[in-house]
From Swiss-Prot:
NCBIfam families recorded: PRK04323.1
Source organism (scientific name): Thermosynechococcus vestitus (strain NIES-2133 / IAM M-273 / BP-1)
Family the entry assigns: Belongs to the RemA family.
Name of the protein described by the UniProt record: Putative regulatory protein tsl2331
Biological classification of the source: Bacteria, Bacillati, Cyanobacteriota, Cyanophyceae, Acaryochloridales
Length: 77
């Protein structure tokens, strides 16, 4: 399981991409996911720093930086 912050976890097998929320296409993706009830906000009211795209059109918002999440995904040396 991948810790995405604040005691929230996702299955790494379902993860397709970890992206920054700053670009216009990602903002549109978040808006569409919210409209279709496919959005999970795991930021606990903090700023969104990473957008996780899961299979099944699920979008997850995280307050952790994408680099932090990738480091947690990578196996320890």
């Amino acid at each position: 399981m991948l810790n995405i912050g604040f005691g929230n976890y996702i299955s790494p097998q379902r993860l397709l991409a970890i992206v920054s929320p700053d670009s216009a296409p990602i903002k549109r993706l978040i808006l569409e996911a919210r409209e279709h009830h496919h959005l999970i906000d795991a930021t606990h009211g903090r700023r969104t720093r990473a957008v996780l795209v899961l299979d099944g059109e699920i979008i997850v918002l995280s307050a952790l930086h994408p680099e932090t999440l990738v480091a947690r995904l990578s196996p320890p040396p």
